[in-house]
Amino acid sequence: MSHSISMHDDDLEKLGESLNEIIMSSKAESVLQAARKKKQEFFDHYIKTKKTLTELLNDLVHTEEVVGQKLLDLDQQKSQMMQEIMKMEQEVQRSQSKSQNLDSELEFLQKELERLRDAEQEIQTLQQEVDEDTTEVIPSAIYVAQLYSKVTKIKLEFDTEPHILKGVHYGADVVTPINIDTSTRTPCEVSDELWSLVKTEW
């Protein structure tokens, strides 16, 4: 019995040695080192990937901020452009209104110019008629007045008020002043008073 146990212990020892030899001969250590290396490479790759992802996320956040700011700037520019467009439309409306007012004023001035031209033509026509009358009538009136003055011996003043008739009658013996308010008398009464100064004796 003891001999069997001793043999069993020897077998176990031999088996352990054999296993150690197998482990050493099967390059388990190199496999373990390779596994550790693989693990380290995987860890390094994980760290690198995580860093890359972090950078990508940071870039994405930065890009979103830049794009968001650009959108805000574009909205602000759009708002400013809309305000400018509204101002330009208002200016166009004011210009159109001014243009319409100017057109109305121009039309009014053209009508006034035509009216003034017509009035000028009428004045020229009247002036021509007056010139003709002056040429023909005034000398005749002067002649009649001179003849009247010689016959009646009455010399009238012409720088008096319109309703006052002033002058002098030169009689043979006496000079009689004349001062008649024609607004209080009829033309016949004035004529009779003047002729009363004239002697009918020849």
Swiss-Prot record:
Cellular compartment(s): Nucleus; Chromosome, Centromere, Kinetochore
One of the protein's GO biological processes: chromosome segregation
Keyword Coiled coil among UniProt keywords: yes
Keywords of this entry: Cell cycle, Cell division, Centromere, Chromosome, Coiled coil, Kinetochore, Mitosis, Nucleus
Coiled coil location: 69-138
Keyword Cell cycle: yes
An annotated GO cellular component: Ndc80 complex
Cited InterPro entries: Ndc80_Spc24
Described function: Acts as a component of the essential kinetochore-associated NDC80 complex, which is required for chromosome segregation and spindle checkpoint activity. Required for kinetochore integrity and the organization of stable microtubule binding sites in the outer plate of the kinetochore. The NDC80 complex synergistically enhances the affinity of the SKA1 complex for microtubules and may allow the NDC80 complex to track depolymerizing microtubules.
Family, as annotated: Belongs to the SPC24 family.
Assembly with partners or alone: Component of the NDC80 complex, which is composed of ndc80, cdca1, spbc24 and spbc25.
PANTHER family, per the entry: KINETOCHORE PROTEIN SPC24, PTHR22142
The protein's name in its UniProt record: Kinetochore protein Spc24
Provenance organism: Danio rerio
